[in-house]
UniProtKB/Swiss-Prot annotation:
This is Putative tail protein gp30. It is found in: Virion. Its main location: virion. The keyword Electron transport does not apply. It holds the Pfam family Tail_P2_I. Belongs to the P2likevirus gpI protein family. Putative tail protein. GO terms for cellular component: virus tail. Coiled coil: none annotated. Keywords: Viral tail protein, Virion. The keyword Ribosomal protein does not apply. Induction: Expressed in the late phase of the viral replicative cycle. It comes from Haemophilus phage HP1 (strain HP1c1) (Bacteriophage HP1).
Amino acid sequence: MKIKLPFWMDKGELSKIAVLFGKWWDYVLSAVKFPFNILDEEHCSERILNLIAYQRDVERFEGEPLELFRKRVKYAFLNAKDAGSKAGFIRIFERLGIGYVEIEERFDRENWDVIKIRISDSQLAKKTELLNLIIRKYGRTCRRYTFEVITKETVSIYHGEFNHDHQSFYVKVN
C-alpha cells in the first residue's frame, strides 16, 4: 500500500513514516487474509487440502489429478445439495468438468428404477473412475444406473425443389 502525502509533506522524515505505515498496513492485511487463504481449496497446500477433504467427506481416488481433487473438495457442499435431482446431477457433471450429459429416468415400464446416463465415448473412456465415484457418492439409493454412449456425427442433407404434375386414373372392376 502506498500512502500519498501532500507535496509539502512528501519530504524528509514524514515520507519515511508514510513508507513505514504502508509496509505495516501490508503486513496487517496479509495477517487478516491468512486464515482465508489457507482454507482456499484452489491455492492451499496439499496437506491442508487433505484436511479440508476429510472434513467434507471427499476421498481421493487412485490416479486422480490434483486439480480435479481440488474441484471435488471445493464443490463438495454444492454437489451434496444437488444430489438426487435430474438437473442437480447434470450440474454436478458440469462442475467437475465432464461435459455434456443427458439423463433419462423411467424409460422402461418394468425396470422403472433404472436411470440412463448418456455421455460421449471419450468421456466414458477418460473418466470412468470419476463417473463411478459420482454415481456412488451422489446417486440415488435404490436406483440402478446404466451408461449409454452417444456419438456426434455430422449429417449433410441436401434439398431442392422438384415440380411435377400428378394424375391418377382409377379403374372400377366389376
